[in-house]
Amino acid sequence: EAHPQAKKFRDYRELFDKEANNIDAVVVSTADHTHAPATSVALQLGKHVYCEKPLTHTVAEARTIAELAARAKVATQMGTQIHAEANYRRVVELVRSGAIGKVTEVFTWCNKGWSDGRFQPSANPAPANLDWDLWLGPAKSRPYCD
């Protein structure tokens, strides 16, 4: 390991319980359904937060995060890594300048094969090094499938 003295935590709540006084900021890159809870705790503790997308899964969670961030008066950012690249910035410039006319409709396409629920993998025991219940966090309980 590159940093053998680095402290490791299996649960973000344990990190905050033990190290809240020793940290100024956090990067939330946990399972996506735990982004809002982890970000909320960090903001309540007055920590700066960089959170991977999605920040939340519901409008209510987003409103809560916005309120907590405003109260904490800390820096926050949601990660949208590729959207900071030159090709995305160029499109924004073209739209804002009017070079392509008024945009009235946008169509998108995604080539990822997201499951529509028809494919149901069989359940397996979770690997020994994975705390499946902890990973599920606030998500609905379901069997582990590799």
Model feature map: region roles:
Residues 1-51, 60-75:
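N-terminal glycine-/serine-/threonine-rich beta1-alpha1-beta2 phosphate-ribose binding loop
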Residues 10, 83-84, 142-144:
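Redox-cofactor-proximal catalytic regions of oxidoreductases
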Residues 14-17, 93, 134-137:
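Charged/polar, solvent-exposed surface patches and flexible loops
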Residues 17-20, 97-100, 144:
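Surface-exposed acidic, glycine-flexible loop patches that form ligand/cofactor-binding
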Residues 30, 107-110, 139:
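Residues that line or immediately flank small-molecule/substrate-binding pockets and catalytic motifs
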Residues 48-52, 56-134:
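A contiguous active-site-proximal alpha/beta segment in oxidoreductase catalytic domains
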Residues 128-146:
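Glycine-rich, aromatic-lined ligand/substrate-binding cores of catalytic
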